[in-house]
């Protein structure tokens, strides 16, 4: 068993920290401390704001002075990150394709979840926090599927998080994905409007008239003998949206373990593919500090490029 000890901290709340609940603030400040311990020290009155006891739902205001007490907690050895996990964290440093004082943008590798949960203790956001232990604030702006690679926005300030998430809600952010799909995509199929319903038991998403309105726009990038490379732009942001909409048209994405086609997977597997061929390649949005439009491109990993080379040769 190892032990984690923190020192007493006094934090002056500025405009950027204001507006968040004290429990969420403490979870950011005490990253290695279990949630149960955080709620306990709040409940016992050990956390003080302006020298007064507060409840977990208290929302911080600019000018507040927060006292965070010293905390000691035992850490089980199996919870300590092994060397393989540390190597993955180090590798992620090289996947950061843009960074400034307000945000960073990651070219997330396929197979990495955006956050821990559902049996996963470590995700991209946890890895970034491990890389930047001094960072006061690191939060996901949006999410992409674990098996999807590509652009992932992370806010470094609460004001940036609010600004960027507002753009996602207002649908002013333009996102473009590259996907390799089975068969010959029809040039006439430029938009798929099909409501999506998620099964809460197995998380499978299907087109269903009772589902949420969902729209994806498509463009053909390159045609092959048995496949098509397409660009997909989701107008709405439903779970598995691009994957289900392509399946719905009869052209599932290569190596999609939920919605794919085994014969097509076997064919592309012979070309070296062993992961979902879906990549968040391009994004356009307004910078949170000055509203200037930005465009970011994330290159595909060499494995996907090699598959395309193999398909061209097969033609």
Swiss-Prot record:
CDD domains: PseudoU_synth_RluA_like (cd02869), S4 (cd00165). Residues 20-93 form the S4 RNA-binding domain. The active site is at residue 145. Keywords: Isomerase, RNA-binding, rRNA processing. It comes from the Bacteria. Pfam families: PseudoU_synth_2, S4. Its EC number is 5.4.99.24. It catalyses: uridine(955/2504/2580) in 23S rRNA = pseudouridine(955/2504/2580) in 23S rRNA. SUPFAM superfamilies: Alpha-L RNA-binding motif, Pseudouridine synthase. One of its GO terms (molecular function) is 23S rRNA pseudouridine(955/2504/2580) synthase activity. GO terms for biological process: enzyme-directed rRNA pseudouridine synthesis. InterPro entries: PsdUridine_synth_cat_dom_sf, PsdUridine_synth_RluA-like_CS, PsdUridine_synth_RluC/D, PsdUridine_synth_RsuA/RluA, RluA_PseudoU_synthase, S4_RNA-bd, S4_RNA-bd_sf. NCBIfam families: PRK11025.1 (NF008249), rluA_subfam (TIGR00005). Belongs to the pseudouridine synthase RluA family. Responsible for synthesis of pseudouridine from uracil at positions 955, 2504 and 2580 in 23S ribosomal RNA. This is Ribosomal large subunit pseudouridine synthase C. It comes from Vibrio parahaemolyticus serotype O3:K6 (strain RIMD 2210633). The gene is rluC.
